[in-house]
Structure formats: structure tokens, C-alpha cells
């Protein structure tokens, strides 16, 4: 077919035809009547051609990623695409010659895939149902178009059908062999009908083959022989190959239009090239999805394992802490138990028991009974008297003897004598002996030195014989000088007998002693009475005589405890039963 078309072009050149498009432009440019008639036909075909051209270009961007699909569906999808595109093309009415030619042209077009263009190495199919595998089934992609002859009165403007396809320089996915394709633009112009002007029709088809192994794509068009009455306009065959960038001679304005469309579409075709990586990247993402899920599962497993390890470590630490805590508590309890057991065994063992003080026990037993015999006494007397004497009895090595002064008014004379005697006997009850008793009222008129000697003999004899207590009644009635002997027995550091008790009684000159009197007041009353009795300004000062200084020393040694005694009616009436 290609050889036939080339031979026809040679014959037409030999017969005197130059460039129909150029000649028609020159003639029509000089004829104003033709120019006015040519304006209308130019607009409609141009718009139609643009619709035919721009629509595939937009489809080119959308369907570029579908290149390289199944090969067996190429022919069928081509037929469906052609049938869908034909209503969109608005062609002028055909004359009889074209009607006779159209069946063969349609048959030829059905054998080729419509709107299939090859540019720069990639095959682009504008049919949305066309799959990429069709490239593998077909060896050649053919684009064929029939150009319709202009109607009567058509001017120099001819239809320029420019079909542009561009593809990326990169090979499509699935291409196993690389190669360069040769692009051929073959067109034949339809014969002008009767009354046609000089204008001809030039169809410029640009076709570029894909990078499939060397195969050629052909653009073929059937041309009808020129009919009678044809003008100077002839047919323009433009053969544009991929090696040549400039249009051939005679292309005229149609060639420039094709070049412009080629430049625009080649620029727009670059974006599908970059977007062609989309399906591949999606497939890669799909292929990577299981890997990502596996990695995520692996990470989750690692996280769970780490959490379990942390929990186990926490449990270990808690167990260690609990062990240390409970262990320390148990150890502490054990130590406390051992200490308590040791203390209990220490105090409960017979060898370590503190020996009981029989003198103290006997005193406490006797002293507790005195409360019943001498009712009406102050609590101070019982508490302070028991505490003072008990302390002295508890001391294993006392530093001085226990000296107590009981005092009472005249109405409590018998009660004072009886109570002091029972207290002294209670103190010495453990020795099963009675206390030494000295009455100062009986020796009031005797010589001071004699009384002093007698008092010394009685006290020393009694203490030496086991009598641990002595009672000196009416201490205020003794001669003043004789009382100096008590320095010997009541000294703080150099007392002759330190483990004994001396009970002294002082009868006040007052008739009654109030029960509410305080211990301090009682002590002052006793002190004033002794100073009045033992210090006399008319008595000469001598070693054997009492003075205020000596009395002050004596008072400091005997006044450790001064207790008031209230009279008991029964004892005052009947006397003290010793």
C-alpha cells in the first residue's frame, strides 16, 4: 500500500503538479470572491479537527499508564473506540465519489486500531478499554484516517487533521527488548469534487512508534482519484519521518499547524511520562503491604516481649523488696524475742533475783496498820513518813541516819507520844526488838553534861545491841547543852550509826494545831520554839553551852522531815497502850 501511494505521488509530480496547497493558497489569495466563500468552510472543519485532535490529547494523559496490557484485546477495543469516536467527528456531506470510496475506507479503518499513535518509544492508546497487554499481541500499530473532500465552493482553506501522540523516552513496563521505531506520516488527499476551488485538503499525521522491538507503524489513507472539474488544487502528500523534524515542501500552513500541535502535545506528553510510574509504585506498595504488616506484627511482638520483660523485672524487684522488707521485719521480731527472753530469764532466774529486804517488808506491814489506829491524820504524814523511812531502809549503805520530827499542840500530847513510839517500833520490827526510848521531860532539871552523857550511853548501847530505832520524847525539854550530843548521831557524814532511825517529838506551847496547817508552817513553828528554849543571852558562851550558831548546825542535821500530828480523842482519854 505504501509503495502504491508513493508511485501515485511520483506520477502526480511528473504530470506537472507542484504543491497543491501552495498553489491553492496563491490563487485563492488573489481571488476575493473565493476568499469570502472560504471563510465559512474553514471555521467548521477547523473546529472539528481541533475537537478530533484535542480530545485524544486529553485521553492521552489519562490512559498513558494502560500501555502494555493484553495483546489479544487490541483489535476489538480498537473497533469499539472507533465506533465511539465517529459520532463526535463532524464531517461535511460526502459526494458520490466519496460514498463509493467510503466502504473500502471504512473496511481499511476497521482493520487498524483507531486513535493509536506511537511517539518516541511508548505506545499510547486512547481507548479506555484498551489494556497494556495488547502491545504484546500486535507487532505493528496502524493509524489510518480518511480525509473527506471539501464541498463545492470551498476555498483555499483545507482541513488539517493533526493527530499527535507523544510518549516518554523511557521504555514502557514489560518491554523486554529495546529498539527504535521509525515514524511514517503518510497521507493522501481526497480528490476535489466538482466546483471545488484551488484549495486542497492536507492531513498531517504524526505517528511515533514505541520502544517495542523494531517494528514500524504506518499511517495509511486512501485517496480517491480527482474527479472532473478539479481546479488547480491538487493532493498534498506529506511524509514525515521521525528522523526529519521539518515538514516537507508544500506543507504550507498545514505543516506549520502540525508543527505547532507537535510542540504543544510533546510538552503536554511529558506529564504522563512521570505519572507512568504510578501503577508501578502502587503495585510496589501493594507488594510491600504484607512486609509492612509483618514488620508491624514483629514490632508488636517485640513490644509485647519488652513489656513482659519489664513486668518480670518489676516483679523480681518487688519480690526482692518484699523479701528484704519481710526478712528485715522477721529478723527484727526475732531479735526482740531474743532480747525479751534474755531479760525475762535474767529477772526470773533465782540466782539473779534481788534479795528481799525483810526490814522493809516488816516496816511496810506495820506502818500500814497505823492508819487504822491513828485516824484523822493528814495524808501528808502517811505519805511522806512512809516514803522517807522506806528509802532509808532500801539503802544498803546509808550515809546518815533517818531523822524525823513529829510535833503537836497541847491537846494532842498523848497522841504525839503514842504515834512516835509506834512508828519507831515499825521501823525496827524486823529485828524483833523495841525502839530505844528517852524522855526529855524527866531530865529537864538535871545537869546538862550529865544528861548529855546519859543520852549518849543509852543510844549507843541500844544501837549496838540491835535496836535500829530510838525515840526521844519532849526534845524541847532537854537541857540546851545536852542536845549537842546529837551532832554525833545525826551528822551528814560522820554519824556514829548510819543505818538507824531517830524519831524526835516536839510539843508546841499552842493549845491546838489546825489540821490545815502546811508542812512549811509546821517546820517554822518547831524552829521558833527551839530557838526560844536553847538560846539564852544570859548564859555564858562556852564549849558545853548552846548558842545560835550551834543550834543552826544542829537544826540542819535533825530537820529533814517535820510532820504535824492531830489529836485522837480515844488516845487522849485512855492514853497510849504500848
UniProtKB/Swiss-Prot annotation:
One family name in Pfam for this protein: LAP1_N
Localization, UniProt: Endoplasmic reticulum membrane; Nucleus envelope
Subunit note: Interacts with TOR1A and TOR1B (ATP-bound).
Lineage of source species: Eukaryota, Metazoa, Chordata, Craniata, Vertebrata
MF (Gene Ontology): ATPase activator activity; ATPase binding
Gene: Tor1aip2
Composition bias, Basic and acidic residues: 58-101, 108-120
Protein name: Torsin-1A-interacting protein 2
Membrane topology listed for this record: Single-pass membrane protein
Region (Disordered): 1-255, 267-287
UniProt-listed PANTHER family: TORSIN-1A-INTERACTING PROTEIN, TORSIN-1A-INTERACTING PROTEIN 2
Amino acid at each position: 500500500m505504501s509503495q502504491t501511494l508513493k508511485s501515485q505521488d511520483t506520477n502526480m509530480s511528473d504530470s506537472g503538479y507542484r504543491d497543491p496547497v501552495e498553489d491553492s493558497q496563491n490563487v485563492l489569495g488573489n481571488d476575493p470572491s473565493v476568499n469570502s466563500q472560504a471563510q465559512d468552510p474553514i471555521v467548521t472543519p477547523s473546529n472539528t479537527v481541533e475537537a478530533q485532535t484535542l480530545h485524544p490529547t486529553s485521553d492521552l494523559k489519562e490512559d498513558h499508564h494502560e500501555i502494555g496490557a493484553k495483546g489479544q484485546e487490541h483489535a476489538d477495543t480498537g473497533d469499539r473506540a472507533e465506533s465511539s469516536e465517529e459520532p463526535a467527528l463532524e464531517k461535511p456531506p460526502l459526494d458520490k465519489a466519496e460514498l463509493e470510496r467510503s466502504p473500502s475506507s471504512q473496511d481499511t479503518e476497521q482493520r487498524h486500531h483507531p486513535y493509536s499513535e506511537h511517539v518516541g518509544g511508548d505506545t499510547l492508546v486512547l481507548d479506555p478499554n484498551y489494556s497494556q497487554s495488547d502491545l504484546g499481541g500486535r507487532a505493528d500499530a496502524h493509524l489510518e484516517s480518511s480525509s473527506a473532500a471539501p464541498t463545492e465552493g470551498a476555498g483555499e482553506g483545507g482541513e488539517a487533521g493533526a493527530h499527535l501522540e507523544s510518549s516518554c523516552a523511557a521504555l514502557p513496563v514489560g518491554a523486554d527488548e529495546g529498539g527504535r521505531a521509525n515514524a511514517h506520516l503518510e497521507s493522501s488527499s481526497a480528490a476535489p469534487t466538482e466546483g471545488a476551488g484551488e484549495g486542497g485538503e492536507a492531513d498531517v499525521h504524526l505517528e511515533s512508534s514505541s520502544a517495542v522491538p523494531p517494528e514500524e507503524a504506518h499511517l495509511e489513507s486512501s485517496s480517491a482519484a480527482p474527479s472532473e472539474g478539479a481546479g488547480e488544487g491538487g493532493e498534498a502528500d506529506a511524509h514525515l519521518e521521525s528522523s526529519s523534524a521539518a515538514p516537507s515542501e508544500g506543507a504550507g500552513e498545514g505543516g506549520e499547524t502540525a508543527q505547532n500541535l507537535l510542540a504543544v502535545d510533546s510538552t503536554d506528553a511529558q506529564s504522563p511520562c512521570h505519572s507512568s510510574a504510578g501503577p508501578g509504585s502502587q503495585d510496589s506498595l501493594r507488594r510491600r503491604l504484607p512486609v509492612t504488616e509483618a514488620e508491624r506484627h514483629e514490632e508488636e511482638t517485640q513490644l509485647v516481649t519488652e513489656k513482659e520483660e519489664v513486668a518480670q523485672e518489676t516483679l523480681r524487684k518487688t519480690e526482692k523488696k518484699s523479701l528484704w522488707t519481710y526478712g528485715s521485719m522477721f529478723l527484727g521480731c526475732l531479735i526482740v524475742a531474743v532480747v525479751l527472753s534474755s531479760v525475762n530469764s535474767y529477772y526470773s532466774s533465782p540466782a539473779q533475783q534481788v534479795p528481799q529486804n525483810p526490814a522493809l517488808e516488816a516496816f511496810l506491814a506495820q506502818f500500814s496498820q497505823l492508819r487504822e489506829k491513828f485516824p484523822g491524820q493528814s495524808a501528808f504524814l502517811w505519805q511522806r513518813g512512809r516514803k522517807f523511812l522506806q528509802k532509808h531502809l532500801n539503802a544498803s549503805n546509808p550515809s546518815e541516819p533517818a531523822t524525823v520530827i513529829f510535833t503537836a499542840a497541847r491537846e494532842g500530847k498523848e497522841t504525839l507520844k503514842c504515834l512516835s513510839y509506834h512508828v519507831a517500833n515499825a521501823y525496827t520490827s524486823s529485828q524483833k526488838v523495841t525502839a530505844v526510848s528517852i524522855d526529855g521531860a524527866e531530865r529537864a532539871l538535871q545537869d546538862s553534861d550529865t544528861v548529855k552523857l546519859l543520852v549518849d550511853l543509852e543510844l549507843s548501847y541500844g544501837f549496838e545491841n540491835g535496836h535500829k530505832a530510838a525515840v526521844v520524847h519532849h526534845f524541847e525539854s532537854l537541857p540546851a547543852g545536852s542536845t549537842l550530843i546529837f551532832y554525833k548521831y545525826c551528822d551528814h557524814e560522820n554519824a556514829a550509826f548510819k543505818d538507824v532511825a531517830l524519831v524526835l517529838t516536839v510539843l508546841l506551847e499552842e493549845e491546838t494545831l489546825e489540821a490545815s496547817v502546811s508542812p512549811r508552817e509546821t517546820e517554822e513553828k518547831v524552829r521558833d520554839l527551839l530557838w526560844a528554849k536553847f538560846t539564852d543571852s544570859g548564859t555564858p558562851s562556852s564549849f558545853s553551852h548552846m548558842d545560835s550558831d550551834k543550834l543552826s548546825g544542829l537544826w540542819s542535821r535533825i530537820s529533814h522531815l517535820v510532820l504535824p500530828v492531830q489529836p485522837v480523842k480515844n488516845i487522849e482519854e485512855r492514853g497510849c497502850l504500848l
